[in-house]
Amino acid sequence: QSIASINEILTANDEGPAPLMPFLEKLKNQFLLLYGAEYPIDLKLSGDDLTVSQDQATDVALVVNELVSNAYKHAFKGRENGEIRVILKNGERYASVTVQDNGTGTEEIRNEGNFGMMLVQMTVKDKLKGKVYVESGENGTSVPFDFLIDKSTETGI
């Protein structure tokens, strides 16, 4: 259902450069509809509004979708509430997106057999030309990933 929502959100835009923040806001609203009643989790978006190609927007949205879904499902077991943050940072050649939670931390996310994380790793490495980092401990999990900015989205190029 989430992948269909991502596709619907992205195809509502034209073929040109896509600002990521509005897409992620719509994705956030989908999460609140999907998980809001079951999980009283505060989902926050912050940082730079990156403009990327439609393809990059789709890939970033898929990765964020998977990471936020994992956080909703696994980070807050045995807890009444929590917080998930999605932080965007724009760099000169690379941009980064970090999905972090203040949950219980998990080694599951590093598990080689975790299909969702394999999808994240492959999408970031192969499609976004970037790298995924995983940090997990008793204060939560942080999964930053970086990616090469598609220069064709800049004006004048």
What are these language model-derived features?
Residues 81-93:
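Short beta-strand/loop element within the Bergerat-fold HATPase_c
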